[in-house]
Each structure stands twice: as structure tokens, then as C-alpha cells.
């Protein structure tokens, strides 16, 4: 049987971008309600606040009762607009960094982790302005029909705070940390463990093998990177005192949260984050791999 002709860079890149974008779109549509709940937990500061959520179940009940079903989809437009290019960048840059690192004397295990770190830092640059808008909309507790539109809220931020690190790009260093650390662990764990556990000939068991490794990858990465996520939400969300900026930089915000609220405050929203990015991480990897394989065969 004759070998397939070599695939040009443009075709290969197009497949990676399309598969990555598809993975992001599917994941955000399935998992966004948990992202809303996670953000709400991260920006609440004390349990004595009458609006604070007592538990995961309580948050779902309160949001549904006071804001309706669409309350769970607040802020979904920015991630939908961002997820396709964001995940496309995530997977495309991971593959490209991995290829570049092939010229360096790194072990395969370390190559996956370093390529993941590079892809996360690149992804953060693309996504941060969308994250600022998303967090602001998710923090709004009015009914879905009463909150500002995505574009009007973005214009409000630009007009009031500008485009810089105090405005549409605030929380940039925290976003770099969040995405860099997550992708480093996520890709590093997934591909290293997948290479260790033997491939199963049964398609169903092989699917479950990949899903299980992806689930663990997303879960472990979430546990490790959540302090950056909490810092990002505090910086990008509403400040405790209107007109006074309390949370400014990533590590100073972490230190402030730790000093005032304790170490566990840096892990606020961990359960909904794991519930979202555990299975969501598995979904992304599987959608990417199966879509990429389909594109290789059909395009």
C-alpha cells in the first residue's frame, strides 16, 4: 500500500485549529453553569453576607430561584466568542511547542509539560479581555433579562477603566498563572499517563481509558491552579468597596486572601471547578482527538 502524501503545514495547522475550536465549543456549552457557580463562590468574602451561598446545592437553588434558568448562562457569550479561538490556540500551540522542543534535549515526559506551559501562556494572552467581561457579568446577581449585554458591558469597562492592566486587561498576570499552570499539568499528565497505560483493542474500553485519564488530568490541574483562579476572580470581579481597588496584583491578592480569610479561601469554588474541568477536560481532549482523526481521514 502506498504511503499517504505528506501533509503540508497549512493543512495540519488547519486541522489542529478546527479540532481545538470544536473541543472548546462543546465543552463550554456543556459546562458553563458550573463556571458561573465557581465564580460566585470565589468572589463572595464571608458567610455572614445574606447573599452568600452555604453549599453547592444552595448556590444552584438560589440562582435558579432568584435569577431563573438563564442565570446559569450569564456571561456565556464572551467564552463562546473566546472558546473557539482560545481552544484552537491551546491545542495548536501545544502541538507547535511540542514540535519545537523536539530540537532540544528534553525527555518526552518533560516535553509534554513544557509545551503545555507554553500553550497556556499563549492562550492567556488571547483570552484575558474576554475573562474580564465574563467575570463581571457572572458576578451580576440581577435576573438575566436585567443585566447589561456583553458588548455594552465591555464598552463600559473600556470607557471607565481603559484597555490596559487596570481595565480590559486587568488580572493579566493571574490569568497567565492560571492557564500556564493548568495546561502544564493537564497536557503533561494526560500524555505521559496515556503512553504508560496500554491501548485497549475494544473501542468502548479505549474510549473509557482516554476519558478516565482526561478526567484525572483536568481534576489534578484544577486543584493545583485554583489559587491563581481565585486571585483572577478577585482582581477582575467587583471590589469590596466601590471606587477603591483592593485586589491589584496576582501574588499580593493571594497573600491578602490568605491573611484575611485563611488558606482555604484560596480554594473557594474548587468543587464546581473540578465538576466542570474534570469531565470538561476529558471532553475537550476526546473531542479534539476524534475530530482531528476525522479531519485527517476526510479532509
Curated annotation (Swiss-Prot):
It is a multi-pass membrane protein. Pfam families: Mito_carr (PF00153). It is found in: Mitochondrion inner membrane. GO terms for molecular function: antiporter activity. One of its GO terms (cellular component) is mitochondrial inner membrane. Gene3D superfamilies: Mitochondrial carrier domain. One of its GO terms (biological process) is lipid transport. Coiled coil: none annotated. Belongs to the mitochondrial carrier (TC 2.A.29) family. This is Mitochondrial 2-oxodicarboxylate carrier. It comes from Bos taurus (Bovine). The gene is SLC25A21.
Amino acid at each position: 500500500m502506498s504511503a499517504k502524501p505528506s501533509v503540508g503545514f497549512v493543512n495540519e495547522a488547519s486541522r489542529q485549529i478546527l479540532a481545538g475550536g470544536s473541543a472548546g465549543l462543546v465543552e463550554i456549552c456543556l459546562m458553563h453553569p458550573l463556571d458561573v457557580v465557581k465564580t460566585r463562590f470565589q468572589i463572595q468574602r464571608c458567610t455572614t453576607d445574606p447573599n452568600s451561598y452555604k453549599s453547592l446545592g444552595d448556590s444552584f437553588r438560589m440562582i435558579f430561584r432568584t435569577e431563573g434558568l438563564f442565570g446559569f448562562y450569564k456571561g456565556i457569550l464572551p467564552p463562546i466568542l473566546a472558546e473557539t479561538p482560545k481552544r484552537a490556540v491551546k491545542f495548536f500551540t501545544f502541538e507547535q511547542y511540542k514540535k519545537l522542543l523536539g530540537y532540544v534535549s528534553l525527555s518526552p515526559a518533560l516535553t509534554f509539560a513544557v509545551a503545555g506551559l507554553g500553550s497556556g501562556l499563549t492562550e492567556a494572552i488571547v483570552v484575558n479581555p474576554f475573562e474580564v467581561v465574563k467575570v463581571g457579568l457572572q458576578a451580576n446577581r440581577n435576573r438575566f433579562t436585567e443585566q447589561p449585554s456583553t458588548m455594552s458591558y465591555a464598552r463600559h469597562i473600556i470607557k471607565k477603566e481603559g484597555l490596559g492592566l487596570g481595565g480590559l486587561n486587568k488580572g493579566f498576570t493571574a490569568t497567565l498563572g492560571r492557564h500556564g499552570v493548568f495546561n502544564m499539568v493537564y497536557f503533561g499528565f494526560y500524555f505521559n499517563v496515556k503512553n504508560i497505560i496500554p491501548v485497549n483493542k475494544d473501542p468502548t474500553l479505549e474510549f473509557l481509558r482516554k476519558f478516565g485519564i482526561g478526567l484525572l488530568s483536568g481534576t489534578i490541574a484544577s486543584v493545583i491552579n485554583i489559587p491563581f483562579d481565585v486571585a483572577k476572580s478577585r482582581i477582575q470581579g467587583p471590589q469590596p468597596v466601590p471606587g477603591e481597588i483592593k485586589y491589584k496584583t496576582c501574588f499580593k491578592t493571594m497573600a491578602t486572601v490568605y491573611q484575611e480569610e485563611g488558606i482555604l479561601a484560596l480554594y473557594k469554588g474548587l468543587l464546581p471547578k473540578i465538576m466542570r474541568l474534570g469531565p470538561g477536560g476529558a471532553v475537550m481532549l476526546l473531542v479534539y482527538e476524534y475530530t482531528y482523526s476525522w479531519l485527517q481521514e476526510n479532509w
